[in-house]
From Swiss-Prot:
Gene (UniProt): gH
Similarity comment text for this entry: Belongs to the herpesviridae glycoprotein H family.
Compartmental location: Virion membrane; Host cell membrane; Host endosome membrane
Record topology, Intravirion segments: 825-838
Coarse class of the protein's main subcellular location: virion
Signal sequence annotation: 1-18
PTM notes: N-glycosylated, O-glycosylated, and sialylated.
Name of the protein described by the UniProt record: Envelope glycoprotein H
Annotated segments matching region Disordered: 174-204
């Protein structure tokens, strides 16, 4: 009966909503697919074989109250004529999934029932005065026969029939938050409104955009009309079936999904319907409507009392938010708190940038590294902020009639970046299963914009030399998210990373925001092909090299400095005037193959570089560990390793070694070194000497073969040469580790200049990335699997002697000397014959 009930609900809801003149009639696709099926089903009559619905017998209540009116005189003879319409009634066909084998029931419902009037009330006489045109409502619940005492049971949804979507409404009825809108601050006390176009500012068509507009993106305005989707009628169905369908003016949609989660946000004029579902948690739903609107809950058919409104906080000056979910007060308190926070986001501001900034900060929050695996509360908060940013962006763009080019590109880029972080870092999604789509642009305008941006990307790479513009070109390719865009910028991105690495080896500190931003988008476009399927040989080679160089750029000093920079930036950001944009603080460690950044030695290094503050040491240590763990989770993609470093995940005998890699070094196109804390059963294995036995280090050279062997590391000194010649070091990797088991650096020897620098050995007083003051051991890893110990680059511990100890030692020497002199004098006096001459 359930499918039939839905059939009834759709028909009646369509009839009720049909009173709004802006509704667009559409043909039921089932009807088109079912043409000709009437020949398969029939009923025997005196005149032939026809399909005819059943009709209630008016003499048999209660169904008889829904019988056809007498004036229609419907019989088996008149039913085939399809003269079923009667002005005072709505007819409804109730059937099941077996239709038309199941002929169904043809019911008639007086329109007075739909109007909520007594059955004996008469309709008002038609007026001759044309009604005043009223603007259609932004949000209109479609309640159907909710208030009809006879037929409402027929329209109950599957909620309360097979499950209860909101088992504990009181748990989801909570007071308004501290930062939500008030009468004096209708957009929230911490809201920083988005910029408005100046009076008379020109609206540029997307087809005329050029590099000059990119230079001045913050003052380039695009007209909303024709660029964004025009609002259109749409019926929003709550997936939880907890409330009746809602008629809205839709403006777009945001969808994020993967193998472990799905998020869908439907945007409308003064409306947002957000659904968050995960494999590891019950689904949650948030609905935002105008302040004066109420969404009624679908109640239990057996309950005589009318159902109340959906749960949620009290309404505000602009919106009312309803929160749905199966969480109860006995469930996880953090999950319930996260859902309540998500319910407050829509009333906390109107600027999309504030929500994206908060989402980035949420990703690096103190508990980000507290546990492994999916974390529903964090995922709900991240996706809630992400969806609300889209809600704010669309509303502001339609309200202003224009959108700034920098805001358009920024929203599309940062929302895509955050979607990946939320999916991989909070939901536990496989990296190659993540998909993301923001459908807020008009389809035709989107194609025009993408074509223009593709042209601008090619023009930037061909004519411009500025690092900032090249970073913008990679950002545009990231926004376009198309194979052609990625292929167009990949050679330039690979060259940029090589150039930055050369500057790093020369002693330059890569800490400016534009460098971070360029590294972020360059790394993203080089890693992207593995998401679209099996990468080509060229794509794999570029990605392997970018991963190797990112690992080389991530020395222990860089990792500690990154942690300190992130802590400082997060503490400084107020998400109002000072925003936190993650690409501006991007670290190569997050794009590397180093998965050891959350180990204790790195945490101590980061704490040692922390500046003085009033933050308690325990809190600072927790924040530091959280940031380090987040960097590791951000970088560690199992799918990425399978795509670009397949030898590290190669299976032998049907099983792969259950060893967690700490560092991967893809040294050739088909071989890698891997650092672990336990030996591997295959490859060429080396045990690193001089390391704490509690945290041993093993270095293994891996290929696609399954043979295993062990070797000893040979100690050597490189021969210094007077002339420039190839020493055979290009392609090798310089690795330094400490007795505590910390790998300080894995530096690629990529040029002849670099190999000459190593051959010259460390120079006292000349700082170099190959030298260190920390007691450590230096190795050289060759592409053929050979490893040698570079004695010249070892740093030995120097004994520290206090000045007091030196003074005491000198005094002791003087006293001992005086004592010996006295003894000799006594001996000479007492034994004179020792000195007699013969």
């Amino acid at each position: 009966m359930g499918n039939g009930l839905w059939f009834v609900g759709v028909i009646i809801l369509g009839a009720a909503w049909g009173q709004v003149h802006d509704w667009t009639e559409q043909t039921d696709p089932w009807f088109l697919d079912g043409l000709g099926m009437d020949r398969m089903y029939w009923r025997d009559t005196n005149t032939g074989r026809l399909w005819l619905p059943n009709t209630p017998d008016p003499q048999k209540p209660p169904r008889g109250f829904l019988a056809p009116p007498d004036e229609l005189n419907l019989t088996t003879a008149s039913l085939p004529l399809l003269r079923w319409y009667e002005e005072r009634f709505c007819f409804v066909l109730v059937t099941t999934a077996e239709f038309p084998r199941d002929p169904g029931q043809l019911l008639y419902i007086p329109k007075t029932y739909l109007l909520g009037r007594p059955p004996n009330a008469s309709l008002p006489a038609p007026t001759t005065v044309e009604p005043t045109a009223q603007p259609p409502p932004a949000v209109a619940p479609l309640k159907g026969l909710l208030h009809n005492p006879t037929a409402s049971v027929l329209l109950r949804s599957r909620a309360w029939v097979t499950f209860s979507a909101v088992p504990d409404p009181e748990a989801l009825t909570f007071p308004r938050g501290d930062n939500v809108a008030t009468a004096s601050h209708p957009s929230g006390p911490r809201d920083t409104p988005p910029p408005r176009p100046p009076v008379g500012a020109r609206r540029h068509p997307t087809t005329e955009l050029d590099i000059t507009h990119l230079h001045n993106a913050s003052t380039t305005w695009l007209a909303t009309r024709g660029l964004l989707r025009s609002p259109g009628r749409y019926v929003y169905f709550s997936p939880s079936a907890s409330t009746w369908p809602v008629g809205i003016w839709t403006t777009g949609e945001l969808v994020l999904g993967c193998d472990a989660a799905l998020v869908r946000a439907r945007y409308g004029r003064e409306f947002m319907g957000l659904v968050i579902s995960m494999h590891d948690s019950p689904p949650a739903e948030v609905m935002v409507v105008p302040a004066g609107q109420t969404l009624d809950r679908v109640g239990d058919p057996a309950d005589e009392n009318p159902p109340g409104a959906l749960p949620g906080p009290p309404g505000g000056p602009r919106y009312r938010v309803f929160v749905l979910g199966s969480l109860t007060r006995a469930d996880n308190g953090s999950a319930l708190d996260a859902l309540r926070r998500v319910g407050g986001y829509p009333e906390e501001g109107t600027n999309y940038a504030q929500f994206l900034s908060r989402a980035y900060a949420e990703f690096f929050s103190g508990d980000a590294g507290a546990e492994q695996g999916p974390r529903p509360p964090l995922f709900w908060r991240l996706t809630g902020l992400l969806a609300t940013s889209g809600f704010a962006f669309v509303n502001a763009a339609h309200a202003n009639g224009a959108v700034c080019l920098s805001d358009l590109l920024g929203f599309l880029a940062h929302s895509r970046a955050l979607a990946g972080l939320a999916a991989r870092g909070a939901a536990g999604c496989a990296a190659d299963s993540v998909f993301f789509n923001v459908s807020v642009l008009d389809p035709t305008a989107r194609l025009q914009l993408e074509a223009r941006l593709q042209h601008l990307v090619a023009e930037i790479l061909e004519r411009e030399q500025s690092l900032a513009l090249h970073a913008l070109g990679y950002q545009l390719a990231f926004v376009l998210d198309s194979p052609s865009a990625y292929d167009a910028v990949a050679p330039s991105a690979a060259h940029l990373i090589d150039a930055l690495y050369a500057e790093f080896l020369g002693g330059r500190v890569l800490t400016t925001p534009v460098v971070h931003r360029a590294l972020f988008y360059a790394s993203a476009v080089l890693r992207q092909p593995f998401l679209a399927g099996v990468p080509s040989a060229v794509q794999r080679e570029r990605a392997r090299r970018s991963l190797l160089i990112a690992s080389a750029l991530c020395t222990s000093d860089v990792a500690a400095a990154t942690n300190a920079d992130l802590r400082t930036a997060l503490a400084r950001a107020d998400h109002q005037k000072t925003l936190f944009w993650l690409p501006d603080h991007f670290s190569p460690c997050a794009a590397s193959l180093r998965f050891d950044l959350d180990e204790s030695v790195f945490i101590l290094d980061a704490l040692a570089q922390a500046t003085r503050s009033e933050t308690p040491v325990e809190v600072l240590a927790q924040q530091t560990h959280g940031l380090a763990s987040t960097l590791t989770r951000w970088a560690h993609y199992n799918a990425l390793i399978r795509a670009f470093v397949p030898e590290a995940s190669h299976r032998c005998g049907g099983q792969s070694a259950n060893v967690e890699p700490r560092i991967l070094v893809p040294i050739t196109h088909n071989a890698s070194y891997v650092v672990t804390h336990s030996p591997l059963p295959r490859g060429i294995g080396y045990k690193l000497t001089g390391v704490d036995v509690r945290r041993p280090l093993f270095l293994t050279y891996l290929t696609a073969t399954c043979e295993g062997s062990t070797r000893d590391i040979e100690s050597k000194r490189l021969v210094r040469t007077q002339n420039q010649r190839d020493l055979g070091l290009v392609g090798a990797v310089f690795m330094r580790y400490t007795p505590a088991g910390e790998v300080m650096s894995v530096l690629l020897v990529d040029t002849d200049n670099t190999q000459q620098q190593i051959a010259a050995g460390p120079t006292e007083g000349a700082p170099s990335v190959f030298s260190s003051d920390v007691p450590s051991t230096a190795l050289l890893l060759f592409p053929n699997g050979t490893v040698i110990h570079l004695l010249a680059f070892d740093t030995q511990p120097v004994a520290a002697i206090a000045p007091g100890f030196l003074a005491a030692s000198a005094l002791g020497v003087v006293m001992i000397t005086a004592a010996l002199a006295g003894i000799l004098k006594v001996l000479r006096t007492s034994v004179p014959f020792f000195w007699r001459r013969e």
